[in-house]
Design a protein with these regions (language model features):
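Conserved phosphotransfer cores of two-component systems
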Residues: 46-48, 71-78, 100
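Helix N-cap/capping motif at the beta->alpha junctions
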Residues: 34-43, 64-65
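Active-site residues of response regulator receiver
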Residues: 56-57
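Alpha4 helix (beta4-alpha4-beta5 surface) of REC/receiver domains from two-component response regulators
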Residues: 63-67, 74, 88-106, 113, ...
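Hydrophobic/aromatic residues positioned on beta-strands within the core alpha/beta folds
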Residues: 84-85
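Two-component/phosphorelay signaling modules centered on CheY-like receiver
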Residues: 14-33, 100
Length: 124
């Protein structure tokens, strides 16, 4: 938390989607730190220490999101991590949340109200 706002690290390679999620989060009084790749996400985690992380499943590689989550957990990241995916419900059904340490999966296109409701419930 910084200046009374929860800090969310959002790792997403689509700039338009980053902008959209930033608008949703900032309207709900969150602060968003954006990273455009898994590598940037690691650096942002190391410097920002956010309260929560949202990771896009498919970035520069098909499973870059799952690799990033594994790397973050190995670095001691103990905050809730959510995955964002456009793959569909098959992913949600096949994903081993326990193995990845995920708090959940959001589907694209994301519903802003649901996102905020879930994040606030998790952080407050």
């Amino acid at each position: 938390m910084r200046a009374g706002k929860h800090v969310v690290l959002y790792v997403e390679d689509d700039a338009d989607y980053q902008d959209m999620v930033r608008e949703i989060l900032e309207a709900a009084d969150f602060e968003m730190v954006a990273a455009s790749s898994a590598e940037e996400g690691i650096r942002a985690w190391d410097t920002e220490k956010p309260d929560l992380v949202i990771v896009d499943l498919m970035m520069e590689e098909v499973d870059a999101g799952t690799s990033l989550i594994t790397d973050l957990r190995a670095r001691g990241c103990d905050v809730p991590i959510y995955m964002l995916s456009s793959v569909g419900d098959d992913l949600a059904m096949s994903m081993d949340y326990g193995a990845l340490g995920l708090a959940g999966v959001f589907q694209k296109p994301i519903d802003g109200r649901s996102l905020i409701t879930i994040l606030k419930a998790r952080l407050d």
